[in-house]
Amino acid sequence: MNENIVKLEKWIKESDNIVFFGGAGVSTESGIPDFRSVDGLYNRKYDYPPETILSHSFFMRNTEEFYRFYRDKMLYKDAKPNKAHYALAELEKQGKCKAVITQNIDGLHQAAGSKEVLELHGTVKKNYCMKCHKFYGEEYIMNTSGVPKCDCGGIIKPYVVLYEESLDNDVIEKAVDYIRHADVLIIAGTSLTVYPAAGLIDYYRGNKLVLINKSVTPKDNIADLVIHEPVGETLGGICLLYTSDAA
């Protein structure tokens, strides 16, 4: 077994204050693509790049076009949690993982059983009326066409942080607090290039910074442990070993 994975297993065994920070790579193993890596594919079908469509100004100006893309590319109702999601939920159940901080909006961590999940970019599971603030579930968006409207006539907006919008300060402060006090910080499935989210890891004060990503990241040089493998296989395998040892 890879010696870095052996070391990570040891750190997980010994710690009861693990914080996980994840990006799109955590969900690709559930069949949800990282739209940044396939811009060309989307550009064939849409007149604008994803970053433009998923912006606040585009939503306000071209709401129908926004929803055409959103239903087509951002909602994956058949996606199921993978080994990474289940491993983290299990570690939380054992009192080891204190929080999952995610850049993803798919709700798969909660579906796997994690309770303390901080969603930096919001979630597709919730939507709200911009006029009366009534909430609607994901199904409502999927089962309507065009621009979804509330009973009051207001336009419904996904509870997702779009480009040009600020992250929720309360969520950020909570994430900073967890990271600052973490013993082990595991960062996985993210290129660490999207700010301000990527800047959160600068608050870590410990000496067990773990990076799990298939490709190199700008922070590889400051990490205490770097594993260039899929996150599901890595965490899933470790969790299997850990739980069988603990049984």
Feature roles, as predicted:
Residues M1-S244:
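Conserved catalytic core of sirtuin-type NAD+-dependent deacylases
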Residues A247:
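Short, basic-rich loop-to-helix N-cap that marks the start of a DNA-contacting helix
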